[in-house]
A protein has these predicted regions:
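Acidic/polar loop patches that form or flank catalytic/metal-binding clefts of enzymes
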Residues: 34-37, 107-109, 183-184
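Short, surface-exposed, low-complexity cationic segments
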Residues: 190-203
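Hydrophobic, well-ordered secondary-structure elements that form the walls
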Residues: 31, 78, 96, 111, ...
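Short loop/turn motifs at secondary-structure junctions and domain boundaries
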Residues: 16-17, 120, 164-167
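Acidic, glycine-enriched loop/beta-strand segments at the rims
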Residues: 49-63, 107-112, 120-154
Length: 203
């Protein structure tokens, strides 16, 4: 119960960054058994509310210190490997909204650098990660003050009715790939000019 944190029932997930609303803390304040609180919240949300498991203990000050280290690259993930259990595809949005705007872990330019050029360098992606003449760049136009990750939800759109979690974001005014707008005001335009990257460092 000490590591389980409800993500709320609104449009934006509550990650309880202040560490004040674990299942254990909620149960203690309400004078109830943690299981009772858990079931009550599931009933209230009609099963929609998700819970965040703080597997690494929640010592956020230590994590912020690690993330400021020069060799830390925060955005390399396996977003597609566990989509039936959780999704971390919103990690770049969370980093820009939470770690720059609210927590001050990074400045905005530093955050952008770490999730673009620094990530490209680690993966060995050539001529990517920066806006330079002759380089390949995908460009996001963002409304920084309103940039926010959405609440994850489950859909069954895989072959044979397979399911996955997806999460949407707010604050993206447009995304341009290969000179084409593929997203405008959060909606896909139908354009798919991108290609699969096959050349990268393998050792």
């Amino acid at each position: 119960p000490a590591l389980l944190h409800p993500m709320g029932m609104g449009d934006v997930p509550d990650y309880d960054m202040g560490r004040e609303n674990s299942l254990e803390q909620l149960a203690a304040r309400q004078g109830k058994d943690p299981v009772e609180v858990y079931v009550d919240r599931l009933i209230e949300s009609e099963g929609r509310e998700l819970w965040n498991f703080w597997a690494f203990g929640g010592a956020l000050e230590n994590q912020w210190a690690y993330m400021k280290m020069d060799h830390c690259v925060p955005m390399l993930a396996d977003a597609g490997a566990h989509v039936g259990i959780f999704t971390d595809t919103d990690s770049p949005t969370f980093l820009l909204a939470e770690l720059t705007r609210r927590q001050g872990v990074y400045t905005l330019p530093e955050a952008v650098h770490r999730i673009t050029l620094k990530s490209a360098d680690v993966l060995g992606l050539k001529e990517r990660g920066a806006v330079k003449e002759g380089w390949i760049a995908d460009l996001n136009i963002i409304d920084y003050e309103n940039l926010e990750t959405g609440y994850p939800y489950y859909v069954n759109d895989f072959p044979h009715n397979g399911g996955r979690y997806i999460v949407e974001s707010a604050g993206y005014l447009g995304t341009m790939v290969a000179g084409n707008m593929i997203v405008e005001n959060g909606k896909h335009t139908g354009s798919r000019p991108g290609t699969v990257i096959r050349e990268f460092a393998r050792n």
